[in-house]
Amino acid sequence: MYQFQQDNQYFIFNFDRTFDQATEFFQAEFWQKQERVIGSAKGRGTTYFLQTEDWFGVNCALRHYYRGGLWGKLNKDRYRFSDLETTRSFAEFHLLQRLYEAGFPVPKPIAARIQKGKLGICYQADILTEKIENAQDLTALLQTQTLPKETWTQIGRLIRKLHDLQICHTDLNAHNILLQQIEQEQKCWLLDFDKCGEKSGDFWKVQNLNRLKRSFEKEIRRMNIQFTEQNWADLTAAYHQ
């Protein structure tokens, strides 16, 4: 792991060396000129999927951090700086690395960057993570098919494992759960650990599950996904085992 500074930019790479193109790695235009953008996904901003296996060992997802809600309309992507380790991208990088090393199914963190403003009070942030191949999020899958009990059981156990580590996923929703097809088997992954972290106690765990259920109910209305109360019962039964 290599951490370094270039002027007002701070980087961390999951390698033991730096790169001449460190700044460019976090610019979509650089990858577009290299003809290495192989896809994208829309959220608050655009996540770019990059052909980087020959450089980093895996293909990557590049994401810029944006604010949401009303505040995001006034200040779309600047955050107040206090210390490096609590910045959005560095905090997510370290949490992903901790989970990845524990064998939890999350994307491997590849690199993170923050760029301070002229006064050093605020910063902008970006992160590069592993792209999970041959995978779709639950909302995409459930628009065209139902999922068997075994899949809901796997999801329930995955969330329980996360909670047993006392990690609170503050945005646990159907979009942040991926199903990867590996030959005849499916593997579940969790994404987007921005603002997530360790949390004591148990009171928040029920709230976490309730948030997930509300996201399914929202997508029933919005996308007519194929999700039933029995699916939820299978998920929660596995969670409580």
From Swiss-Prot:
It comes from the Bacteria. It is a peripheral membrane protein. It is an enzyme of class 2 (transferase). Signal peptide: none annotated. One of its GO terms (molecular function) is ATP binding. Disulfide bonds: none annotated. It catalyses: an alpha-Kdo-(2->6)-lipid IVA + ATP = a 4-O-phospho-alpha-Kdo-(2->6)-lipid IVA + ADP + H(+). One of its GO terms (cellular component) is plasma membrane. It is found in: Cell inner membrane. GO terms for biological process: lipopolysaccharide core region biosynthetic process. Gene3D superfamilies: Transferase(Phosphotransferase) domain 1. Pathway: Bacterial outer membrane biogenesis; LPS core biosynthesis. Its EC number is 2.7.1.166. The active site is at residue 171. Catalyzes the ATP-dependent phosphorylation of the 3-deoxy-D-manno-octulosonic acid (Kdo) residue in Kdo-lipid IV(A) at the 4-OH position. This is 3-deoxy-D-manno-octulosonic acid kinase. It comes from Haemophilus influenzae (strain PittGG). The gene is kdkA.
